[in-house]
Amino acid sequence: MRIEKYTEVLNWYKNPLNRDYSKTLELDVAGVPHVFAWGGLHGAIPKYHGEGWFVNVDVASYYPSLMLVYKWLSRNVHDPSKYAEIYHTRLKLKAEKNPMQQPYKIVLNSTYGAMKDKHNAMYDPRQANNVCVGGQLLLLDLIERLEDHCEIIQSNTDGILVKLRRYEDFEMLDDLCWE
């Protein structure tokens, strides 16, 4: 991850005075008003209406993916390989359009929620914040790389909606996202 343009976001999260979960940072990112908070990232061009080639850059099972790739799963989980097994089973079923993927999705996503619940055995607010804030920063890094090549329309906690300048730009967009 290399955030070079919107370093104000990094500094905001590092500042101990901003550890209050009700605080937010409002900042224009790629010409779009954004709100960064401990619970997620949201930005959108107000009352946008447009035509053209739109791509929804959506990360499948974003929080579960982050928990596995960066080892941000609750430190109270005794066997992280079981979570990985559920994750891979869910993605396989989803690709097959099998409705049985839904219970797996619930298990994966509720694990993140359990990490923020002080009455749950998986309670681990540090790891939950790593997932949420780390995910936002990874998306911000992607926005920095995309903004010179397409129009950012909207972003949220697990994806970005962009408008291509030309249809032929899709391959370049795909390459940037794959990084």
Predicted regions mapped to residue ranges:
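Conserved acidic
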Residues: 1-179
